[in-house]
Protein backbone atom coordinates (compact mmCIF):
# COMPACT_ATOMS: atom_id res chain seq x y z
CA UNK A 1 0.00 0.00 0.00
CA UNK A 2 1.58 3.24 -1.17
CA UNK A 3 1.24 6.78 0.15
CA UNK A 4 0.35 9.91 -1.79
CA UNK A 5 2.64 12.91 -1.48
CA UNK A 6 0.04 14.56 0.77
CA UNK A 7 -0.03 11.51 3.05
CA UNK A 8 3.75 11.46 3.28
CA UNK A 9 3.71 15.08 4.41
CA UNK A 10 0.74 14.54 6.75
CA UNK A 11 2.36 11.58 8.52
CA UNK A 12 5.96 12.78 8.30
CA UNK A 13 6.46 12.86 12.09
CA UNK A 14 5.36 9.24 12.32
CA UNK A 15 7.38 8.10 9.32
CA UNK A 16 10.65 9.34 10.84
CA UNK A 17 9.74 7.96 14.27
CA UNK A 18 11.58 4.84 15.34
CA UNK A 19 8.98 2.24 16.25
CA UNK A 20 6.50 3.48 13.66
CA UNK A 21 8.28 4.48 10.45
CA UNK A 22 6.94 3.77 7.00
CA UNK A 23 5.99 0.15 7.78
CA UNK A 24 4.08 1.17 10.90
CA UNK A 25 2.27 3.94 9.05
CA UNK A 26 1.24 1.41 6.42
CA UNK A 27 -0.16 -0.81 9.17
CA UNK A 28 -2.15 2.15 10.46
CA UNK A 29 -3.48 2.87 6.97
CA UNK A 30 -4.58 -0.75 6.58
CA UNK A 31 -6.09 -1.02 10.07
CA UNK A 32 -9.78 -1.14 10.92
CA UNK A 33 -10.60 0.06 14.44
CA UNK A 34 -13.97 -0.11 16.16
CA UNK A 35 -14.60 2.59 18.78
CA UNK A 36 -17.43 1.93 21.21
CA UNK A 37 -18.92 5.25 22.24
CA UNK A 38 -18.47 8.73 20.77
CA UNK A 39 -18.60 10.43 24.17
CA UNK A 40 -16.04 11.62 26.68
CA UNK A 41 -13.44 8.95 25.90
CA UNK A 42 -14.47 8.23 22.32
CA UNK A 43 -14.20 11.88 21.25
CA UNK A 44 -10.44 12.39 21.84
CA UNK A 45 -9.80 8.77 20.90
CA UNK A 46 -11.38 9.30 17.49
CA UNK A 47 -9.49 12.53 16.96
CA UNK A 48 -6.09 10.97 17.58
CA UNK A 49 -6.82 7.80 15.62
CA UNK A 50 -8.01 9.85 12.66
CA UNK A 51 -4.97 12.11 12.90
CA UNK A 52 -2.71 9.05 13.09
CA UNK A 53 -4.06 7.80 9.78
CA UNK A 54 -6.02 4.72 10.82
CA UNK A 55 -7.58 3.52 7.57
CA UNK A 56 -11.08 2.78 8.80
CA UNK A 57 -12.89 3.90 11.93
CA UNK A 58 -16.17 2.33 12.99
CA UNK A 59 -18.14 4.00 15.77
CA UNK A 60 -20.92 2.44 17.83
CA UNK A 61 -23.25 4.96 19.46
CA UNK A 62 -27.02 5.44 19.50
CA UNK A 63 -27.09 8.72 21.42
CA UNK A 64 -27.56 12.35 20.41
CA UNK A 65 -25.40 15.31 21.37
CA UNK A 66 -26.61 17.16 24.47
CA UNK A 67 -25.40 20.56 25.64
CA UNK A 68 -24.04 18.98 28.84
CA UNK A 69 -21.81 16.71 26.70
CA UNK A 70 -19.76 19.60 25.35
CA UNK A 71 -17.81 20.08 28.59
CA UNK A 72 -15.77 16.99 27.65
CA UNK A 73 -16.91 15.46 24.33
CA UNK A 74 -14.66 17.63 22.22
CA UNK A 75 -15.39 16.08 18.84
CA UNK A 76 -18.85 17.68 18.95
CA UNK A 77 -19.69 21.40 18.91
CA UNK A 78 -22.56 23.67 19.92
CA UNK A 79 -24.23 23.47 16.47
CA UNK A 80 -24.33 19.67 16.87
CA UNK A 81 -26.68 19.69 19.88
CA UNK A 82 -29.59 17.38 19.05
CA UNK A 83 -27.67 15.67 16.27
CA UNK A 84 -26.76 11.98 16.25
CA UNK A 85 -23.29 11.56 17.73
CA UNK A 86 -22.19 9.27 14.92
CA UNK A 87 -23.16 11.92 12.37
CA UNK A 88 -21.36 14.67 14.23
CA UNK A 89 -18.30 12.45 14.67
CA UNK A 90 -18.28 11.55 10.97
CA UNK A 91 -18.08 15.23 9.99
CA UNK A 92 -15.32 15.91 12.52
CA UNK A 93 -13.23 12.94 11.38
CA UNK A 94 -13.60 13.91 7.71
CA UNK A 95 -12.56 17.48 8.52
CA UNK A 96 -9.49 16.27 10.41
CA UNK A 97 -8.40 13.60 7.93
CA UNK A 98 -10.37 12.95 4.72
CA UNK A 99 -8.30 9.83 4.05
CA UNK A 100 -10.05 7.94 6.87
CA UNK A 101 -13.09 5.82 6.06
CA UNK A 102 -15.84 6.24 8.65
CA UNK A 103 -18.67 3.82 9.41
CA UNK A 104 -21.31 4.75 11.96
CA UNK A 105 -23.27 2.05 13.79
CA UNK A 106 -26.40 3.69 15.18
CA UNK A 107 -27.07 1.17 17.93
CA UNK A 108 -26.05 0.09 21.40
CA UNK A 109 -23.56 -2.76 21.53
CA UNK A 110 -24.86 -5.72 23.51
CA UNK A 111 -24.37 -9.47 23.87
CA UNK A 112 -26.60 -10.16 20.86
CA UNK A 113 -24.76 -8.01 18.30
CA UNK A 114 -21.24 -7.65 19.72
CA UNK A 115 -19.53 -10.55 17.96
CA UNK A 116 -20.79 -9.55 14.52
CA UNK A 117 -19.66 -5.95 15.05
CA UNK A 118 -16.26 -6.87 16.46
CA UNK A 119 -15.53 -9.40 13.71
CA UNK A 120 -15.42 -6.65 11.09
CA UNK A 121 -12.47 -4.85 12.71
CA UNK A 122 -8.86 -5.52 13.68
CA UNK A 123 -8.74 -3.71 17.03
CA UNK A 124 -11.51 -2.57 19.38
CA UNK A 125 -11.43 0.38 21.80
CA UNK A 126 -14.18 0.54 24.41
CA UNK A 127 -14.99 3.94 25.86
CA UNK A 128 -18.50 3.02 27.02
CA UNK A 129 -19.91 4.13 30.35
CA UNK A 130 -21.66 0.97 31.58
CA UNK A 131 -20.65 -2.52 32.63
CA UNK A 132 -23.15 -4.32 30.41
CA UNK A 133 -21.44 -2.97 27.30
CA UNK A 134 -17.95 -3.58 28.71
CA UNK A 135 -18.65 -7.25 29.41
CA UNK A 136 -20.33 -7.75 26.02
CA UNK A 137 -17.41 -6.10 24.21
CA UNK A 138 -14.73 -8.01 26.12
CA UNK A 139 -16.45 -11.38 25.65
CA UNK A 140 -16.90 -10.73 21.92
CA UNK A 141 -13.28 -9.67 21.48
CA UNK A 142 -12.14 -12.88 23.17
CA UNK A 143 -14.29 -15.06 20.93
CA UNK A 144 -13.26 -13.17 17.77
CA UNK A 145 -9.56 -12.93 18.79
CA UNK A 146 -9.47 -9.14 18.65
CA UNK A 147 -7.27 -6.94 20.89
CA UNK A 148 -9.38 -4.75 23.17
CA UNK A 149 -8.29 -1.45 24.70
CA UNK A 150 -10.73 -0.58 27.46
CA UNK A 151 -10.87 2.57 29.56
CA UNK A 152 -13.15 3.98 32.22
CA UNK A 153 -13.44 7.28 34.09
CA UNK A 154 -14.97 8.34 37.38
CA UNK A 155 -15.22 11.83 38.78
CA UNK A 156 -11.47 12.33 39.31
CA UNK A 157 -10.15 8.84 38.54
CA UNK A 158 -9.55 6.77 35.43
CA UNK A 159 -8.28 3.33 34.46
CA UNK A 160 -6.93 1.71 31.32
CA UNK A 161 -5.86 -1.77 30.24
CA UNK A 162 -5.36 -3.81 27.08
CA UNK A 163 -6.81 -7.30 26.74
CA UNK A 164 -5.41 -10.07 24.54
CA UNK A 165 -6.78 -13.19 26.30
CA UNK A 166 -6.72 -15.24 23.10
CA UNK A 167 -2.90 -15.21 23.35
CA UNK A 168 -0.45 -16.60 25.91
CA UNK A 169 2.33 -14.88 27.81
CA UNK A 170 6.02 -15.79 27.78
CA UNK A 171 5.43 -18.43 30.46
CA UNK A 172 2.82 -20.16 28.33
CA UNK A 173 -0.10 -19.04 30.50
CA UNK A 174 -3.19 -17.47 28.92
CA UNK A 175 -3.39 -13.70 29.13
CA UNK A 176 -6.10 -12.47 31.52
CA UNK A 177 -9.62 -11.59 30.44
CA UNK A 178 -11.76 -8.67 31.59
CA UNK A 179 -13.54 -11.19 33.82
CA UNK A 180 -10.22 -12.00 35.51
CA UNK A 181 -10.00 -8.35 36.51
CA UNK A 182 -13.71 -7.83 37.26
CA UNK A 183 -15.38 -11.23 37.77
CA UNK A 184 -18.82 -9.71 38.32
CA UNK A 185 -20.38 -6.32 37.58
CA UNK A 186 -21.05 -4.14 40.63
CA UNK A 187 -24.55 -4.19 42.11
CA UNK A 188 -27.06 -2.12 40.19
CA UNK A 189 -27.09 1.47 41.41
CA UNK A 190 -23.79 1.19 43.30
CA UNK A 191 -21.83 3.22 40.72
CA UNK A 192 -23.34 6.68 40.22
CA UNK A 193 -23.88 7.91 36.69
CA UNK A 194 -21.85 10.78 35.29
CA UNK A 195 -24.91 13.02 35.54
CA UNK A 196 -25.07 12.35 39.29
CA UNK A 197 -21.40 12.33 40.31
CA UNK A 198 -19.90 14.62 37.68
CA UNK A 199 -16.66 14.11 35.78
CA UNK A 200 -13.61 16.30 35.20
CA UNK A 201 -13.71 17.16 31.50
CA UNK A 202 -9.96 17.25 30.91
CA UNK A 203 -9.59 13.81 32.49
CA UNK A 204 -11.56 12.22 29.66
CA UNK A 205 -9.22 13.90 27.20
CA UNK A 206 -6.15 12.51 28.96
CA UNK A 207 -7.50 8.98 29.08
CA UNK A 208 -8.93 9.07 25.56
CA UNK A 209 -5.51 10.09 24.22
CA UNK A 210 -3.88 7.29 26.20
CA UNK A 211 -6.38 4.83 24.74
CA UNK A 212 -5.39 6.03 21.27
CA UNK A 213 -1.75 5.40 22.17
CA UNK A 214 -2.58 1.83 23.17
CA UNK A 215 -4.49 1.27 19.92
CA UNK A 216 -1.60 2.64 17.83
CA UNK A 217 0.78 0.44 19.83
CA UNK A 218 -1.41 -2.61 19.15
CA UNK A 219 -1.38 -1.88 15.42
CA UNK A 220 2.29 -0.97 15.01
CA UNK A 221 3.67 -3.41 17.56
CA UNK A 222 6.08 -1.15 19.43
CA UNK A 223 6.64 -0.87 23.17
CA UNK A 224 5.10 -2.73 26.08
CA UNK A 225 1.28 -2.79 25.99
CA UNK A 226 -0.87 -2.78 29.11
CA UNK A 227 -1.62 -6.51 28.94
CA UNK A 228 -2.04 -7.86 32.46
CA UNK A 229 -1.54 -4.34 33.83
CA UNK A 230 -4.17 -1.85 34.94
CA UNK A 231 -3.09 1.78 34.68
CA UNK A 232 -4.77 3.98 37.30
CA UNK A 233 -4.88 7.77 37.17
CA UNK A 234 -5.82 9.93 40.15
CA UNK A 235 -6.48 13.36 38.65
CA UNK A 236 -7.19 14.91 42.05
CA UNK A 237 -3.64 14.25 43.30
CA UNK A 238 -2.12 13.86 39.80
CA UNK A 239 -0.76 10.39 40.51
CA UNK A 240 -0.30 7.42 38.19
CA UNK A 241 -0.08 3.83 39.37
CA UNK A 242 0.12 0.52 37.51
CA UNK A 243 -1.25 -2.67 39.07
CA UNK A 244 -0.46 -6.13 37.72
CA UNK A 245 -3.30 -8.63 37.45
CA UNK A 246 -3.17 -12.29 36.49
CA UNK A 247 -5.15 -14.88 34.62
CA UNK A 248 -7.86 -16.43 36.77
CA UNK A 249 -8.09 -20.19 36.06
CA UNK A 250 -11.76 -20.11 37.08
CA UNK A 251 -12.82 -17.43 34.58
CA UNK A 252 -15.50 -18.61 32.12
CA UNK A 253 -13.74 -17.56 28.90
CA UNK A 254 -10.27 -19.12 28.91
CA UNK A 255 -10.22 -20.74 32.35
CA UNK A 256 -9.44 -24.40 32.91
CA UNK A 257 -13.13 -25.37 32.76
CA UNK A 258 -14.08 -23.04 29.91
CA UNK A 259 -15.56 -24.68 26.79
CA UNK A 260 -13.03 -25.23 24.04
Report residues per predicted region.
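Adenine nucleotide-associated cytosolic modules
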Residues: 1-260
Amino acid sequence: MSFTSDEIERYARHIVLRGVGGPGQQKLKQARVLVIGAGGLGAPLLQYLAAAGVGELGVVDDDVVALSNLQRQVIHGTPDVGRKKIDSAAVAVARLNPNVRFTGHDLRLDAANARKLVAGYDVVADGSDNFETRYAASDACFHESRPLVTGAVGSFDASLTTLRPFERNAAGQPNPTYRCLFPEPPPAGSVPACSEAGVLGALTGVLGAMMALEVVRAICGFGDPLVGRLLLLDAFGMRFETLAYDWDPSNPLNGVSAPR
